[in-house]
A protein has these predicted regions:
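Hydrophobic, lipid-facing positions within transmembrane beta-strands of outer-membrane proteins
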Residues: 77-81, 118-124, 180-184, 225-229, ...
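Outer-membrane beta-barrel "beta-signal"
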Residues: 386-402
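Detector for outer-membrane/organellar transmembrane beta-barrel domains
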Residues: 222-224, 228-354, 365-367
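Extracellular loop and loop/strand-boundary signature of outer-membrane beta-barrel proteins
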Residues: 66-70, 171, 213-217, 250, ...
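Transmembrane beta-strands of outer-membrane beta-barrel proteins
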Residues: 27-35, 91, 95-99, 131, ...
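Gram-negative bacterial Sec-dependent N-terminal signal peptides
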Residues: 1-22
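Outer membrane beta-barrel
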Residues: 24-39, 63-203, 232-236, 370
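Gram-negative outer-membrane beta-barrel proteins
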Residues: 37-45, 103-109, 139-143, 204-208, ...
Length: 402
């Protein structure tokens, strides 16, 4: 046997274990493209007067405000692609991973947040539960599907996280619905319908200060961190959820925030042999520590999902209270401001219709009725407005999953 044949034989032997492992590994390319055409209205800021971080160009000068007529735009709504996979390790243990990136499907531009800008992690799974490390949403976000429109797959300005959890805002501005890097998460296996989730995100100096996505690496010196925990029950027609999140010095030094959400949903259609008619509700309390004192806000919402003509009709009403606490009037964190007329109501109705298992059409209308001193706006593809504006939007969209 010549040297070349020996080398080939040795290479084949060396690669054999890798080939065997590859046969046990499963890797899937997946994603979704969600595009819609929108008509949005609302009083917005003059171009010469840029809005501050909370999307509110305040001030009594009328020159800083424009009454904006209807604006037509095409938007990409959480479009994404990714790779996910698993490898069986033996003895019931599985290695799991996922790498997911945002896609600007309306312009074709790459995401400014980087390649792994969405749910990205590696971990282990077994009959003891699931552990993973990376970047992902917190257990607090898992409350949203109980009352929100996430199950109808109509993610857009129709997002029901516009007011709940200050959804449009990152941690550095007081949001509680952010995707967090530098995270460790454990999920229990289901036990008689019960599950629990615990996540810790460290914001210590593992990156450039005050940079990154969603407030990532908020400070190199103050050791900011996030704890998020959730407990859930799902059995038959009933779903319950309780979540709590504590943000330590995420906005600035010596100021801590925390939030509590309780949600429930019940498929009342199952009582009549026609499942799918689902009612949901949520209560939330946000608490912010400020230099001037405490600031709190309550939020309630009720929703209904009704199966109609092969699709799903979804309706929701939510109300944010005025900002309260011992901080003086005018104290604000994000959209939450202490004082009278700082609350809002959010109304929404939408209909989604599946053309197939992977393609969905949807249409809807959303409106946020801000009181005189409030400036809440849409969650996804937000729209900068002035205090007291009532932003609204009509959408027609299509989503394809692959």
């Amino acid at each position: 046997m010549n040297a070349k044949r020996v080398a080939v034989a040795l290479a084949a032997i060396a690669c054999a274990p890798l080939a065997a492992q590859a046969q046990l590994a499963k890797v899937t390319l997946y994603g979704s493209l969600n595009l819609d055409v929108e008509w949005v209205t609302g009083a917005t800021c003059a171009s010469a007067v840029p809005p501050p971080a909370n999307n509110n160009c305040s001030g009594s000068d009328p020159a800083s405000q424009i009454s904006n007529p209807t604006v037509m735009r095409v938007s990409s709504n959480s479009s994404r692609f990714g790779l996910r996979g698993s490898e069986y390790l033996g003895a019931g243990q599985v290695a799991i991973f996922q790498l997911e990136s945002s896609v600007q499907a309306d312009t074709g531009n790459s995401s400014s947040s980087g390649l792994a800008s969405r749910e990205t992690f590696v971990g282990l799974q077994g009959d003891w539960g699931t552990f993973k490390a990376g970047k992902f949403l917190t257990p607090y976000d898992d409350i949203l599907p109980l009352f929100g429109n996430a199950p109808t797959l109509t993610t857009s300005i129709l997002s029901t996280a516009a007011v709940w959890a200050q959804g449009p805002l990152p941690k550095s501005l007081g949001g509680f619905d952010a995707r967090l890097g530098n995270s460790l998460r454990y999920e229990t296996p289901p036990l008689n319908g019960f599950t629990a989730e615990l996540q810790f995100s460290t914001r210590d100096s593992s990156g450039n200060a005050n940079g990154g996505d969603n407030g990532d690496h908020a400070s190199e010196t103050r050791h900011a961190s996030v704890w998020s925990v959730g407990a859930f029950y799902s059995n038959g027609p009933l779903d319950l959820g309780l979540a709590y999140e504590y943000n330590r010095q995420m906005r600035t030094a010596d100021q801590n925030d925390h939030a509590l959400s309780i949600a429930a949903a019940y498929d009342i259609g199952s009582l009549f042999g026609s499942p799918g008619l689902r009612l949901g509700g949520v209560y939330e309390r946000l608490n912010y520590g400020t230099l001037a004192g405490s600031l709190t806000r309550d939020f309630w919402a009720l929703s209904a999902t009704v199966p109609i003509a092969g699709g799903s009709l979804y309706a929701m009403w939510g109300r944010a209270s005025n900002g309260k606490g011992d901080a003086p009037d005018g104290t604000g964190v994000g959209f939450v401001v202490k004082g009278p007329d700082t609350g809002c109501d959010q109304w929404e109705i939408s209909y989604s219709y599946p053309l197939s298992l992977r393609t969905l059409l949807y249409a809807g209308y959303v409106r946020i009725n801000n009181r005189a001193n409030a400036a809440y706006t849409f969650n996804i593809n937000d729209y900068s407005i002035v205090n007291g504006a009532r932003p609204s939007g009509t959408v027609f969209g299509i989503t394809h999953f692959f």
